Amino acid sequence: MNVDVLIGEILTLSMMAFALGMDAFSVGLGMGMAKLKRNQVFQIGVIIGLFHVIMPLGGMIAGQFLSGALGALAGYIGGALLLVLGIQMIVASFNKSGEQIISPHGFGLFVFAVGVSLDSFSVGLSLGLYGTKPILTIFLFGLFSMVLTWAGLLLGKKVQTWLGAYSEALGGAILLSFGLKLLLPI
């Protein structure tokens, strides 16, 4: 293979990975306002990165067998999950007991990770049809998503210290609006 072609493919996949990672950054920004500890930030970033490896790989495999209709469905499912997470965070911000219905650990982290990585499944579907290099693709998708999730979570954590009690409601509003963006053709 020509070195120029390989560099071009790496740059193209890196741009895609960055675009998909920006979803995770935006959602991480909202989730970071939920008073997370550093080990939670690390864990969330790793889990999001892993899901951005698993989902496009699954998409690439499925892309060989399925039509493009599933791509649109994945976006709607991801939007609905983010909508639910956003509403939960807004409700929890007004809940005086401090309990969260969906929290960023355990099953809540799983729901969060699936929500932000469903779009990478759709991209994987498309890339599976074009025959891109799976190892390079999933490595870049996972790396970019993990790093951008950490950046979003840490920035959200800083904003949380500035906004105090209102930060979780703001974080929920960010997730809610991002979910609506995925659900509605705006």
From Swiss-Prot:
Question: What's a Pfam family this protein contains?
Answer: Mntp
Where is this protein localized, as stated in its record?
Cell membrane
Q: Which UniProt keywords apply?
A: Cell membrane, Ion transport, Manganese, Membrane, Transmembrane, Transmembrane helix, Transport
Question: Record's superkingdom?
Answer: Bacteria
Which GO CC terms are listed, alphabetically?
plasma membrane
The record gives the membrane topology as:
Multi-pass membrane protein
One GO MF term attached to the UniProt entry:
manganese ion transmembrane transporter activity
Membrane-crossing ranges are 5-25, 41-61, 72-92, 107-127, 135-155, 166-186
Q: What does this chain do?
A: Probably functions as a manganese efflux pump.
| Sequence similarity | Belongs to the MntP (TC 9.B.29) family.
Please give the HAMAP family that the UniProt record associates with this protein: MntP_pump
Quote the protein name from its UniProt record. Putative manganese efflux pump MntP
